[in-house]
Swiss-Prot record:
Protein source organism: Clostridium pasteurianum
GO MF, one example: homocitrate synthase activity
Protein name, as recorded: Homocitrate synthase subunit alpha
Domain Pyruvate carboxyltransferase: 3-255
Function: This protein is a Fe-Mo-cofactor biosynthetic component.
Biological process, per Gene Ontology: biosynthetic process; carboxylic acid metabolic process; nitrogen fixation
Domain of life: Bacteria
UniProt subunit comment: Heterodimer of an alpha and an omega chain.
Protein family: Belongs to the alpha-IPM synthase/homocitrate synthase family.
Stored Pfam families: HMGL-like (PF00682)
Gene designation: nifV-ALPHA
Keywords, alphabetical: Nitrogen fixation, Transferase
Catalytic activity: acetyl-CoA + 2-oxoglutarate + H2O = (2R)-homocitrate + CoA + H(+)
Gene3D superfamilies from the UniProt entry: Aldolase class I
EC number: 2.3.3.14
């Protein structure tokens, strides 16, 4: 398969204003999303505790065809909490732009590299499948991104998430950056974009054409601020422009499944 969908409705999507999901809501949504042919479901952030940890644990226990991932900071405590939930994938995320490293972490590039290495090694030694998220990649120094990719690939990480966290990318530039990373490091790229300029689908497709093998999507494109890449529309774009069918059933079926999720989300569009 050329592109694999990572659905992040239950993590990034839930950050949409006005959305508040119960544990049962999340479990039901995960079941339906898995039926839609996605490779992976980002189920949440166990380190938040409470219902969040409960819902991730319940989803992981379902034994769905989709892999279940949990989002973590560069924290061994976060990682241990995710492992307790029984997820398939531990995703470790860090800001990588100088702006966010300084303002969000109050650290420097050296600290980020050292702590990313430390937590990745920790998770790998716990026999976890690990993916790494590079937050604010689109405002980061490309050479620094490549250095981090080389480091984590050498450690044994097979996939990295390039995140256009603030939604500033356009397709031509994103294609160029993904291509440069792929030319330097044989690591799988997962693209995570936001729709602030209305180009989430176009950017995800451009990243795919540049060699990205994973694309993050949400149901209806819901998410923080202007949202994320719309799952249904992106699947249709891939199908029509490349001939690849992410969902092997009738397309009307996937529309019905989206409508089921929209009812749970209490969305009227």
């Amino acid at each position: 398969m050329g592109i694999n969908i990572v659905d992040t409705t239950l993590r990034d999507g839930e950050q949409k204003a006005g959305i508040a999901l119960s544990v049962q809501d999340k479990v039901e949504i995960a079941k339906i999303i898995s039926e839609m042919g996605v490779h992976q479901i980002e189920a949440g952030i166990p380190a938040m505790g409470g219902d969040e940890k409960i819902s991730v644990s319940k989803i992981a226990a379902l034994g769905l065809p989709s892999k279940i991932a949990a989002w973590n900071r560069m924290s061994t405590k976060d990682i241990d909490t995710s492992i307790e939930c029984g997820v398939d994938i531990v995703h470790i995320s860090s800001p990588v732009s100088d702006l966010q490293i300084k303002t969000k972490l109050e650290k420097d590039r050296k600290w980020v590299a050292e702590n990313l290495k430390r937590t990745v090694i920790y998770a790998l030694e716990k026999d976890c499948e690990v993916t790494v998220g590079l937050e604010d990649s689109s405002r980061a120094d490309l050479n620094f991104l490549i250095q981090l990719c080389e480091m984590i690939f050498a450690l044994g990480v097979k996939r990295v998430r390039y995140a256009d966290t603030v939604g500033i990318m356009e397709p031509k530039e994103l294609y160029s950056q993904i291509k440069k990373i792929r030319d330097k490091v044989p690591i799988d790229i997962e693209i995570h974009v936001h729709n602030d300029f209305g180009m989430a689908i176009s950017n995800s497709f451009a990243a795919f054409k540049a060699g990205a093998k994973f694309a993050d999507c949400t149901i209806t494109g819901m998410g923080e601020r202007a949202g994320n890449c719309d799952f249904l529309k992106f699947v249709k774009v891939i199908q029509e422009l490349t001939g690849e069918k992410i969902y092997t059933g009738d397309f009307e079926d996937i529309i019905e499944k989206e409508n089921e999720i929209k009812k749970i989300l209490r969305l009227n569009w």
